[in-house]
UniProtKB/Swiss-Prot annotation:
This is Small ribosomal subunit protein uS8. The gene is rpsH. SUPFAM superfamilies: Ribosomal protein S8 (SSF56047). HAMAP family: Ribosomal_uS8_B. It holds the Pfam family Ribosomal_S8. PANTHER family: 40S RIBOSOMAL PROTEIN S15A (PTHR11758). One of its GO terms (cellular component) is ribosome. One of its GO terms (molecular function) is structural constituent of ribosome. PROSITE patterns: RIBOSOMAL_S8.
Length: 130
């Protein structure tokens, strides 16, 4: 059986892993998943990530906790295969009043909403993280 939305699966694995206080979660790798993991690492939401394997690469994400609580409070898919959500620079959302980030896929790659605003670029809103 094929997976319909691999990005939603990735976000769910992160959410469930933190709810179960896991050290790390692993999943099948793709370029987009690695780009999202890179943004999450830069923003401090995960401790790290690594890709292992040649034939079927696996992405392993090391989860991050602060005083025993998960760093990620909210991780929510926005644009999905059945309903893509695109926003212009001026319409990019501020997650939790600027405390969280929206991960945006632009023509220059995957970046946060702040970086997209700074570069005056819109794009597809992949997910919200706070």
């Amino acid at each position: 059986m094929s997976m319909q939305d691999p990005i939603a699966d990735m976000l769910t694995r992160i959410r469930n892993g933190q709810a179960a206080s896991k050290v790390a979660v692993s999943m099948p790798s793709s370029k987009l998943k690695v780009a999202i993991a890179k943004v999450l690492k830069e923003e401090g939401y995960i401790a790290g990530y690594s890709v292992a394997g040649d034939v079927k690469p696996e992405l392993e994400i090391e989860l991050k906790y602060f005083q025993g609580k998960p760093v990620v409070e909210l991780i929510q898919r926005v644009s999905r295969p059945g309903l893509r959500i695109y926003k212009r620079t001026t319409d990019l959302p501020k997650v939790m009043g600027g405390l969280g980030v929206a991960i945006v896929s632009t023509s220059k790659g995957v970046m946060t909403d702040r970086a997209a605003r700074k570069a005056s670029m819109g794009g597809e809103i992949i997910c919200y993280v706070a």
